[in-house]
A protein has these predicted regions:
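Short amphipathic, helix-prone segments within low-complexity/disordered or flexible regions
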Residues: 2-6, 16-20, 24-27
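Extended, histidine- and acidic-residue-enriched regions that form the cofactor-binding/catalytic faces
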Residues: 27-273
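Polybasic, lysine-rich low-complexity intrinsically disordered segments
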Residues: 9-13
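Generic low-complexity, intrinsically disordered sequence content enriched
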Residues: 7-8, 254
Length: 273
């Protein structure tokens, strides 16, 4: 995963004063620690993968605004954290040979256009990317599962997985979901980031956004995107977020994805149910 770094502001509050450092920058050990998993595609060799027919788990995220307090790659970080933990859990159960792929870090984020930093490749391009990724990887991987961290990617994932399955490839996908989660850059995502990347949360910039139900906001968002309903780019309330809550939410996401992958019952669009 390619991470985006920005100059630190002097006024920024530190969440983890005793975190280890890389150079002069504090690093969160929880995010950078490599959880035990069978292997990672980026550090494997072709010879190691020969004749093993591994199952491949691929995080899918985005580069988009997450309010004034969260990094642009928030969705990718969450998808990667969930995918890594799921791969480790499945490996512990000896459920196939799982390999964690580098994240697909760009997604369909058109609703966030107009906010600086957002880079959206759109649904059509993402669909094509996922299809070609799947066609290539399926030549040596026995199964493909995309772990999605951004709601705007679901249309592309559904179309791509449906085509891959029609072509005879064993592909599926699931999203990082939690019960009663708010929509964007609010309590849910901020809590998870406080757990996995505390030094990259600008806690002094946290402000409550629009907390209306997403169903009520959608008519305006279809016309003008997130900016039409929240000047901050926040849908929810990040001021209530805690690292402890983030740990619980992440575990819930991992549990849900693990169950769906273990059960492996894809619907007509390849979504695991």
């Amino acid at each position: 995963m390619v991470r985006l770094w920005f100059p630190m502001k002097k006024s920024r509050k530190s969440i983890a004063a005793h975190a280890p450092t890389i150079g002069a920058r504090q690093v969160n050990s929880a995010y950078h620690r490599r959880v035990a998993s069978p292997s990672e595609l980026s550090t494997s060799t072709s010879r190691q993968l020969q004749r093993t027919s591994p199952a491949l788990i691929i995080p899918v995220g985005s580069v988009e605004q997450h309010g004034p307090h969260l990094p642009l790659d928030t969705d990718t970080r969450i998808a990667t954290a969930v995918a890594r933990s799921v791969a480790a859990r499945l490996a512990d159960r000896n459920e196939s040979n799982w390999v964690l792929a580098p994240a697909i870090g760009y997604g369909a984020s058109g609703e966030h256009e107009g906010f600086a930093g957002t880079v959206s490749i759109g649904t059509s391009a993402l669909r094509l990317l996922l299809v070609e990724f799947g066609r290539s990887a399926a030549q040596w991987a026995s199964r493909l599962v995309f772990v999605n961290g951004h709601g705007g990617n679901t249309e592309a994932l559904a179309a791509a997985a449906a085509l891959l399955r029609y072509e005879g490839r064993d592909a599926g996908w699931c999203s990082c979901t939690a019960e009663n989660a708010d929509a964007h850059a609010g309590h849910t995502e901020t809590s998870v980031l406080l757990h996995i990347s505390p030094t990259d949360v600008w806690v002094d910039e946290c402000l409550a956004g629009n907390s209306a139900p997403l169903s009520k906001l959608m008519p305006q968002m279809r016309q003008g995107g997130v900016a039409a309903v929240s000047e901050l780019g926040v849908l929810g309330d990040p001021t209530t977020a805690t690292a402890q809550e983030g740990e619980r939410i992440l575990a819930e996401m991992v549990d849900a994805c693990s169950r769906r992958i273990t059960r492996w019952v894809p619907d007509r669009d390849g979504m695991l149910t």
